[in-house]
Amino acid sequence: MSDILNTILARKADEVAERSARVPLAELIARSADLPLTRGFAAAMQASIAAGDPAVIAEVKKASPSKGVIRPDFHPADIAVSYEFGGATCLSVLTDVDFFQGSDAYLRQARDACTLPVLRKDFTVDPYQVYEARVLGADCILLIVSALKDAQLADLSGLAMQLGLDVLVEVHDVDELERAVQVPVPLIGINNRNLRTFEVTLQTTLDMRAAVPRDRVLVTESGIVTQADVQLMRSNDVNAFLVGETFMRAAEPGESLRQLFFAHD
């Protein structure tokens, strides 16, 4: 596990304690009991792919630990509208405050502005956060294999599905992938960024794709910058993408998405 991930996870444990002191778990559970159905994140991804289109998870991200502020002029609702117009299948919204300058409010703003399913992009390590995601209005959560033990993976994914949330399980190497496929969720993300060096190579996805069961949707994450990158993936039967920074640096994120994935149409 990388030093930055260790630091983030230690902070998450404190954050859960702080938040549960303000809003007790029992209250969250009660609030999660009578909510509208989620929008169907995995189903939307599968439908895009079945139609022959790339399934694009477009990320709403202000900053990152490695790059600092990526988009100073940051308006989640406007970004969400732009992404939907540009052809995104789903959204990913950063809610981590301390390391990514995210906010729960950003998720609400983005989701309220569009009809797309939304992933809560955060470091989920505790059942409290799963209930919290459902109450916030998320349609899907992220579980990072390198941050969790097998029992946690099973428990958190099981709870999410029980609450009607989809789960994107993220891996970085073959060992993590072997652990991820034990969890019965349809979405497996392969992050092309090395957690130790922060280097990005698309070869990570290409090397691992054959080990992903055919009944799962493989989502390639990080490093998709050019139409050639997209074509490389699609020619290798990788049809789902999570892209953030490339779009966040563009004046019009949705137009950047359209140019990257649909300009040939």
Curated annotation (Swiss-Prot):
Pathway: Amino-acid biosynthesis; L-tryptophan biosynthesis; L-tryptophan from chorismate: step 4/5. It comes from the Bacteria. It catalyses: 1-(2-carboxyphenylamino)-1-deoxy-D-ribulose 5-phosphate + H(+) = (1S,2R)-1-C-(indol-3-yl)glycerol 3-phosphate + CO2 + H2O. Keywords: Amino-acid biosynthesis, Aromatic amino acid biosynthesis, Decarboxylase, Lyase, Tryptophan biosynthesis. One of its GO terms (molecular function) is phosphoribosylanthranilate isomerase activity. The keyword Lyase applies. Its EC number is 4.1.1.48. GO terms for biological process: L-tryptophan biosynthetic process. Pfam families: IGPS. Belongs to the TrpC family. This is Indole-3-glycerol phosphate synthase.
